[in-house]
Amino acid sequence: MMRTTSVLSTLLAFTQAFYVPGTYKSYRDGDTIPLLVNKVYSDHSELQYAFTELPFVCPPTGRIRAGHLTSGTSITLNLGEVLRGDRIVVSDYELIMGIDEETRYLCSRTIDLEGIRKAKELIRDGYVAEWIVDNLPGATSFQTTDKSRKYYAAGFKLGDETTARSGGPAEYLLNNHVTLVIRYHRAPGKDGDKGKKVVVGFEVFPRSITASHRNDSGLPEHIEGEHEPLILAPQANSTNSTDTEDEPTTLTIPYTYSVYWREEERLEWQNRWDMYFVAQDDSANVHWLALVSSLLICGLLTAVVSVVLTRTIRSDIRGRQDLTLSSIKPKPNHKSLSPKREKANLLGPIADLDTEDIILDEEESEDVAAWKLLHGDIFRAPAYGGLLAPLIGSGMQLLYMAFGLLVLSTLGVLNPSFRGGYVSVGIGLFVFAGIFSGYFSARIYKTFGGQMWQKNVVVTAALIPGLLFATIFILNLFVWMQASSTALPFGTLIALIILWLCVQFPLVYAGSWFGFERMGAYTHPIRANAVPRQVPDHRWYLRNGQRFLLAGFVPFMVVFVELMFVVKSLWVDKTTYYYAFGFMGTVSAILMITVVEVTLVATYFLLRSENYHWWWHSFAIGGSSSIWVYAYLAYSYFTKLHISGFVSSMLFFAYGFLACAVYALLTGTVGFLAAYAFVRRIYGAIKVD
């Protein structure tokens, strides 16, 4: 208990995660800074689109830009950026440090009815565009409810849907003018002494301005005044044609922009991302309240487990001690096995309890605790052990990956400025953790009596990664048919296959060889009988369905609030960033402790009901909270989200199911290992003749 308290205290000290800002880039007055365009996305859809591929925006002209970059050139992306749908391209927008541009003409784009329809569809679904300057996403500026602080929401709207003034169908207004406000600060150190500056803010203010009343350069006559909006509808005056008999089928859209540079004296470069997290700071009290409630739940469970371990089980072992010791009737088919000393690990040597070894006699079964009657079957290999072992191995692989991601995120190595870093590093950790997957899978497989360890290697390396890859590939076909940037390019699919077969597979093989050949099976204090014991019928509350739902609800309550914030960031409001990794790390630690305690209690009551099928049971109990997590996702879909379209809905439920399956595998593995250590410990305290 003291050890648990100290661990939680340490984690509480780091609940506010920070980020490592990296290396700044400074600019002199007159330096050209490239503006990169990325993608458009919406809270109402799971489909994203590359900005430059939209049929109604200005296509790149191929002009040379800053740093010898050519407009239209794609920026090299990491694996995580590709998987999250990024398509970053150099634009034709020209930004020169320190030089304001009141109005500048970009281009005029003539679109047909299909282009108008696509623009209306994206505006109706609330799509926003993501642009990037100096690795900062263009943001829409807001004020807090008390108007004391300003904060950013990444992206800006493509347009607005309004009610027609004539009372007819809704009108769609396209934002064809943007005012770009670049905020800068004096560069730190010697660069600042040389007059250099760093970018600390990038604000975008979009407007819709009609195509009429423009000068010969395509600029509005008075940019600061009120203007009629640009309505997305074919217009006869979009061309010089005088034929009024035919219905207009095209619309010409002029694009302009303004640039203003403003010094920000109070915001330094290393804190420039704080503007995107102000909204999260307001919710810190909710995080703290949830953390306290999670600690209370964990503390209550700890008390229950303490009673079970220190009182109930100890009294079970000591109970009727004199009677059993005086009525020893040795049986030739039972032998006392002394546990061998292994290297220290979770499933290592069985520690001695402060109790004397007890001699059990089957004829005295009515006078001893029910769980001790299972000594001849408790370590019997489970059904489908060849499947359980790879699942446990993959669960350990995910556990190492999740731990690494949480540590790196809490330390600030993984942060929003490292775009795609969370996914890229996660894949890397998962692949290289294959060696742990093979090691644990092989040892458990051999413990179950398996001999074909090469077959176990194939199952371990292919089962979970193969199912994930196959599901993502099938979903990718639907996304590809929608021409979305979320669709994985063919080269990325090949790269993932290479990582899987050429990197992870050999690592799983190496770990399996070491675990199977060098370390061997885990030892058990009691040998299984030749004839299995019959399992009695259970009461209704001990049946699997009810038991899993009840056991899973407690861990779900621990993670509920953090899950709510994650769902909000991923689906409800995609313009926000989730960066409360300090809270997430602490809640994750509490979750693991809760899963362990719930599994121990459930396993104990299972054994008390004279059921020795605890292997799969402990795995299922540990992962049972995933049922509630998926139920919450479904609830959010129908009550909080506004996702429309068959493909987007399918992607939501499919990716939600994959996330819950991974979560179940991870927590199920934790539950299994806890139950395994628990069972070996309590049965190691008795000696059977």
Question: Where in this protein do the model-derived segments appear?
Answer:
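Soluble extramembrane domains flanking the early transmembrane region of eukaryotic membrane proteins
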Residues: R3, A13-L295
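Membrane-lumen (extracellular) interface motif
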Residues: S283-W288, M396-A462, G466-I498, V559-G585, ...
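Hydrophobic alpha-helical transmembrane segments corresponding to the first two to three helices
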Residues: D274-W480
